[in-house]
Every structure is written in structure tokens, then in C-alpha cells.
From Swiss-Prot:
Residue numbers binding S-adenosyl-L-methionine: 54, 83, 106, 155
Catalytic function, reaction form: adenosine in U6 snRNA + S-adenosyl-L-methionine = N(6)-methyladenosine in U6 snRNA + S-adenosyl-L-homocysteine + H(+)
Keywords of the record: Cytoplasm, Methyltransferase, Nucleus, S-adenosyl-L-methionine, Transferase
Molecular function per GO: U6 snRNA (adenine-(43)-N(6))-methyltransferase activity
Signal peptide region: none
Function: RNA N6-methyltransferase that mediates N6-methylation of adenine of U6 small nuclear RNA (U6 snRNA).
Membrane-spanning parts: none
Taxonomic classification: Eukaryota, Fungi, Dikarya, Ascomycota, Taphrinomycotina
GO biological process, one term: rRNA base methylation
Subcellular localization(s) per the UniProt record: Cytoplasm; Nucleus
EC number, UniProt record: 2.1.1.346
Protein name in the entry: U6 small nuclear RNA (adenine-(43)-N(6))-methyltransferase
Amino acid sequence: MPIYILIERSVKNGRIDFWNEDAIRTLGKAILDRDYSLRVEFPENRLCPMVPNRATYIRYIHDLLSSTSGQKDKKRIIGLDIGTGASCIYPLLGCRMYSYDFVGTEIDKFSFETAKSNILQNNMESQIKIVLRSKQDCLLPDTEGMEEFTFVMCNPPFYEHEEDFINFKQNPPSGVCTGVYHEMVTEGGEVGFANKILTESKKRKGIQWYTCMFGKKSSVPAVVDKLREQNISNYGIYELALGKTKRWIICWSFQAMRPHNELIRPSSTSLSKYFPHKVLQNWTLDPELCAQIDDILQKFLDDNKIPWSKKGSVLEISTKSITWSRKARRISKSQTSVSSLEGQMKCELNVIDNQLQCKWIEGYDYNVYESFCSALARALRDNKK
């Protein structure tokens, strides 16, 4: 039956009835068909995902990868979707939107078979592989001869206890819940599930980014505390707000590339104590300083023996040691070589309008970046005198 006929049957007085399971499934099918040319079946006895926030999660991952991949990184992108569900929504969207390849895992045989059917009817069997797992298996499967996964994504089950799920089913906040027990309940809830991924991730550091999307704001502090406890400093928080629904994504990586501020630090400050360090510093330049800024920056870099190159209007900095601190200068005076204080870091300097920006691009130690910015700020102040 054509989608538009199904939509007509699901709309009353110009509105979608979000308490009607058939209406929810029909809306999802219509959006996927119209916006992504995807034909997807949502079985009546399984979770029907909200397409807009799923698509936003995929876009977020694309932006995350784009902001932390060098120009030479043109390799195949392979995503792992843990608990892909009957709809197989994330792999289908990822393949359609960005031509990613995917492996999806599923513990439920019915959802596994339905996901495979959705893949086949969209002719994506060469891009998407679904793997049937058990609850006892680790969450990160072997690559089975393929390249390592580029990223991991997951919507963990929300609830820790069955009674919480039953109460939610009876009193949902804004619409009917079509999910079944194994899709909504897990030991430890979504925090426990994310912590399992975190534990396993320490043995798979070649994966560029791990991500989890949470339905409870209270889960964010618990997971960030665990990341900090494990000394994982390259992490981020991202808030999705679509209509009345809010979701939170936490990402982490064992690699050195640093994402843009807007991908790891929400504009809302309610979780600010759990934010990672800023990766962008700004200084406002007065007209006189702005006119001299190129000479000032090059003198600062050359005087401190900081390697740099210019690409258009951007100064690219790549250091292997700290040469700008007072301690480094004392050491260099007593030695014939440059200071051996460790300080591997890459950053970019750029002037936009009357703003000097310093963007942290790569590095493991925030203190090195902060120290560089402090030295640069002193140089700017000295030139204002």
C-alpha cells in the first residue's frame, strides 16, 4: 500500500496521534521513504525508532570523524552498531547518507531476521552485515578478517529493573512505547551497558571513536566519572534536542586528534562540571595589534624555536617539545640543544575579523596546549605595552 495512503489513515485533524502505534510506525516509514529513499518494515512487536534523532546521531558521528581525520585519511569507514534492532535503522541511514559500511549486532533472533530483510529490500547487503550474538558474548565482536571498525555507536537499553520499564510503558511521557523487554532493560541500565563498552574499548584502541546515546541526563555524570577514572581525557558530550525530546551522546577516543568544541561541549551549562577541556582559545585584538599580528606571531614562534608552516591564512604549529616556558629557556641556555621537555602537540592559529584563534588539533596532554596558549597570551600583552 502506498505510504501516502497509510499517512492519511494515521492523521486526524491534521495531527499525528503519537499514542497510536500504527501512526508512529507509518510516520517512520514515510520519513525514511521521502527523505532517504529507504523502504523499512517496523514489526508490531518491536521498538519503532524516531527517525529524526537517529539521523541526527549519524550526522554527529560524521562531523566527529570529519573533525578528527587528516586529509590523508581516505580509508573505508566501517561502523559498528551494537544492538541494531529489527529496523536496522543506523546502518541503513549511515549507508544512505554517507556510504559507510556497517556491522550490526543483535541478540534477538526475530530482530536479527527482520534486520536482514530490511537490508535486502534496500539492496545494501554488500555494505551491511548483521551478526547474531548472545548475552554472554562481549559487546565488541571480532572484525573477522575485515579492517578494524572506525567507530562504535549504541543506544543502550534505558532501564535497569523490569518494574521501571513496566511503569514507563504504562505512563510514557509523550507517546506510546513500542519497545519490548530486551530492548529496554539491561543489567545496570544504560550506564552499566556503556561501562561494559568502555571496559572492552581499552583492548581495542585502534577504533577511532566510541559513542553512546543516552536517554537519561543523570547517566552523563556517571559515565564521565568512569572515563576520568580511567584517565581518558579525549572525550566529549553532545546534547540532542528535537522537539520535547532530549538525548545525550558521549564519545571517547584513545587517539590524539581533538574534535571541535561544539561537538564535545554543549551550549547548555547544566553539565558544565563534566565538560572536557576547551580546544579553542580566542583573543580579541585591537586595531593596532591586528595590523601587526602576522609579524608578532612569527617572531613569537621563531624566538621560541617552535616549528610552524603557513597554509593560506592559517599558521600550523607542530611541536615535539616545550620550548616556550621559562623552565625550557633555562635548560636551553645550559645546553647546546633545544629543550628536551616533552610537549608533542599540534594546533592552528588563525585571525578571523579581530579575533585570534588557537585551535588544539592533536595531542594527549592538555597542559601542553594550555602552556602554549599562556605563552602566546603573554606575547600579545607584551606587544600592547
